[in-house]
Amino acid sequence: MTMKPNPMVILTGPTAVGKTALSIALAKKINGAIISADSMQVYKYMDIGSAKIMPEEMDGVRHYLVDELDPSDEFHVVRFVEMAKQALKEITANGQIPIVVGGTGFYIQALLYDIDFTEQECDSAYRRQLEELAETRGNHYLHEMLKAVDPASAEAIHENNRKRVIRALEFYHESGERISEHNERESQKTSPYNFAYFVLNDDREKLYRRIDVRVDAMVKAGLVDEVARLQQMGCHADMVSMQGLGYKEILAYLNGTSTLEEAIYIIKRESRHFAKRQLTWFHRERDVIWLNKPDFEYDDTKILTYMMDVLQAKGILPRSE
């Protein structure tokens, strides 16, 4: 079979499932470079809480979108797609295969199907009006406004996520169309890539145990000191970076609003909830190939062999003679 253009390999799955080690082994086997689809690993100085891959673990494999932004920078889906597309160009120009690795399904979907989430020109007067309403009447009032015009968006966006609530109201105000309908239409696009979309998974109880072990290891490795250093650098709870799982809870402890034991308990609980939401997302996605670790007897070599067969069948890799 001839090789097809625009190859892309995706390796995702819930938090703590073991994506990192498998991604390195895969990259070395297929001459790949890795694009991180993680909303936290892109930030410098945020290593422990994001479970960031360290240079010595990379084993010579080039990683993009790791350690590229300051914690004060905003990182969102539009910026991710911009940066990831630039990385894709570099990787293919180097004759390598891009491997998108990470657990942020929304980012992966946007890149894979080239979904348009770019900001349109907005009516800043209307935005100011909404911001004033939020200040005077509260987030709940704004969220009720959204529920009246776009119930699906109101269902998907938490009322405390004021920025996204305002964006959805703005979109409706400017276009007369619900942003939920726009996003749904965009998500039905076909992909411009020849891709293989792998989701690594494990038994739920084992996954939850791994999450607990990982959180304990993070605390032992110095998570509290890491967050304290970030605080000294001027990082605060309103920054996108500091709203990440593990950071906001330790920040609450440092600010005296919880004990360390409570913070650790909440991180573990919220990490389990996050893993559950990730799996729900991946089950809804099209064309995914599940890699259930028990089916491969927890042997990464067997998983890799299966992945190689899939990549050859899809024309992403040449068939071995």
Label each region the model flagged.
Residues 1-321:
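Phosphate/pyrophosphate-binding catalytic cores of soluble transferases and nucleic-acid-acting enzymes
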